[in-house]
């Protein structure tokens, strides 16, 4: 069985083609800067006999043009003989709202719901839907499955997902906390339980997905019971360009003081804040280098980021009662030892203690970063959202 996973962003397409007999990728690729003057195309074959790679810089008009390039290169590179022979396509869809608590086979009703939910994810759901529509038009017989970022968090209790706003706002407009990065949190939690030989339905963990977008999840008995993101991905941790938790009155105050419209203020909070807002850069590598050289703003940004993560760990330890593991994943969580060290520093009395030599040089794959005989295991686990989407796609396909 061959499954193609598509992850369409506002100006990008990320994809992986899997052979589901062994859950191994046959090819992967990334198309970036769609709609800009010079776009980028990168496709890599993972076939044992042929590890060829294609890199191009060219104008890519829109997502449909990008998807045509994906189809063309998968066949031209000999990765697949016929695109129509793909068994299914799994789509990452960011917002599933109250409607979708699990992956679903796409039909007209599902497409209408994804479009309706675009008001909650205006940057993501419309392009996710564009990918679905492209496949439906070009290859109508290929089954498509939508896998929702929010679905894993559908198990949160109402006292965790509700905002203390007039209840009618929830009833009329579904204003509540949904959470995101669910596919990643789910994947690394399953991998951790397997690694620690704990039955997943008895596994308690705090998962830290730390990248340019970042979130924490509290997982109890294998289910999400709380997470840091809310109605949108703006809530929670300090991120690359997003502010995370702030006093809501700040929005009105900025608008008045700086003479900004609501739209302009929201742009500041989403694209000009977070690490970038504090030190002018959202690249963790640059920030770490600058901080080591004594740059005060870079040091402040780093400390603020780590402190916010640490506060969420403490809160979720209380929510869970028992914690088997703390799991670092995502670009920053996997690759920046200094951030992991700063987050775990001072938590020894809670049973969290890093083994510094291992943390500094963890190697590849799943790594136990904790000191021997500590109460809570600290793990570094590379996430694989595409594989998790492929696995969920396969399960839905087998049911139908």
Curated annotation (Swiss-Prot):
InterPro entries: Ac/propionate_kinase, Aliphatic_acid_kin_short-chain, Aliphatic_acid_kinase_CS, ATPase_NBD
GO cellular component: cytoplasm
Main location: cytoplasm
CDD domains (alphabetical): ASKHA_NBD_AcK_PK
UniProt cofactor note: Mg(2+). Can also accept Mn(2+).
Active site: 149
UniProt binding sites for substrate: 92
Necessary cofactors: Mg(2+); Mn(2+)
Pathway assigned to this chain's UniProt record: Metabolic intermediate biosynthesis; acetyl-CoA biosynthesis; acetyl-CoA from acetate: step 1/2
Disulfide bond residue pairs: none
Residues given in the record as Mg(2+) binding sites: 7, 385
BP GO terms, sorted: acetate metabolic process; acetyl-CoA biosynthetic process
Documented EC number(s): 2.7.2.1
Cellular location(s): Cytoplasm
Catalytic activities: acetate + ATP = acetyl phosphate + ADP
UniProt site positions, description: Transition state stabilizer: 181, 242
Function description: Catalyzes the formation of acetyl phosphate from acetate and ATP. Can also catalyze the reverse reaction.
PANTHER family in alphabetical order: ACETATE KINASE, ACETATE KINASE-RELATED
Subunit structure, interactors included: Homodimer.
Protein name, entry field: Acetate kinase
Gene responsible for this protein: ackA
